[in-house]
Curated annotation (Swiss-Prot):
Family: Belongs to the bacterial/plant glucose-1-phosphate adenylyltransferase family.
Subunit structure: Homotetramer.
UniProt organism field: Bifidobacterium adolescentis (strain ATCC 15703 / DSM 20083 / NCTC 11814 / E194a)
Chain's role: Involved in the biosynthesis of ADP-glucose, a building block required for the elongation reactions to produce glycogen. Catalyzes the reaction between ATP and alpha-D-glucose 1-phosphate (G1P) to produce pyrophosphate and ADP-Glc.
Name of protein: Glucose-1-phosphate adenylyltransferase
EC id: 2.7.7.27
Claim: Nucleotidyltransferase is one of the keywords in the record: yes
Amino acid sequence: MAKNPKILSIVLAGGEGTRLMPLTRDRAKPAVPFGGVFRLIDFPLSNLVNSGYMQTVVLTQYKSHSLDRHISTVWRFSPLLGNYVSPVPAQQRLGKHWYLGSADAIYQTINIIEDVQPDIVVIVGADHVYRMDFQQMVQQHIESGAEFTVAGIRQPISQSNQFGVIEVDPDHPNMIKSFQEKPQTTTGLPDDPNSILASMGNYVANTDALFAALSLDEKAEDTKHDMGGDIAPYFAARNEAGVYDFNSNEIPGATPTDHAYWRDVGTLKQFYDAHMDLISYVPEFNLYNTEWPIYTLSGNLPPAKFVHAGRDRLGHATDSIVSPGVIVSGGEVHHSVLSPNVRIHSWSQVVDSILFDGVVVNRRARVYKAILDKNVVLTENSTVGIDTEHDLARGFTVTPEGITVVPKGTVVDD
């Protein structure tokens, strides 16, 4: 392996995101807004850029128009240096079908990898919120002699059926003894029986070994063509799979609170909870770390504005993230995230909620513990999140935890 190996990054952005419906009704999961001004895709791409990896392809599939547009608009690099972030839709190069799984997605674009001729391929998911220096993972991958390395993070054993579960070789702590994808039952870690080492869905692979594994998987009958379900176990069975402990990853500017923060936001509850992590005085995930920034398009929006300071009508926001272009005009916002161009009118109230771009909350309307998609309008005196039965009767989604989700463009008039 060369001292400075050539790296190609691949972002797997083809998932439907059905568990995030209705937020994914009109957009791909990686295009879902997050944290006020970002989209989920901005987090893995920012991590790759901050790691120094400037050649990236993003494999897209379902409802990818807004995702493709965002990547093409925001993630433009100078071609003079050979740098790029390139969205690649499903090519159907090997048959008239969509990607059959994450491994098949890479196999169907193997011509792109062959054109670049990298020594190592870094493969990451597109729908997690975290900071990570992939150079540190690549360095350990090279030093360990593994052909394929999986990033791991501790998670509660009760969630083992949601993750790939890694068993580490006790004699070689950087190598994987076995890998099970979403097992119904498993054993905990030796030092913590209530935890597992879960796959983060991030991989580093030697190119030749990856090609060989993908070629075998494509021909196999007993396969789901999945990186976690098929490719990782293949390398583990051959004693060629390494494991990288995410907890050892050091990020400039990280705080003790948000060190090794990682969240899967694949469900509405996880998506909501990850937003709530952003807005405390000492946030669990600090969006304001300028030493490892999360990049996106800033836009030409004016600053947020707060107006009306009367005794009975005070425009204010507390414990909240308020994006550019927002006007809080005599309303109250608490413990919430407001995306650009939101309007909060007099005597209205927004509490414990996430409002996407262009939402309008008119006078005396109330929003509690809700996610409002783009361009939702609450008319005067209307409510969301106050009466669960009423919300369900209007066709809104209400999670078991009581989070109400209103689809894009809805006018709430009662």
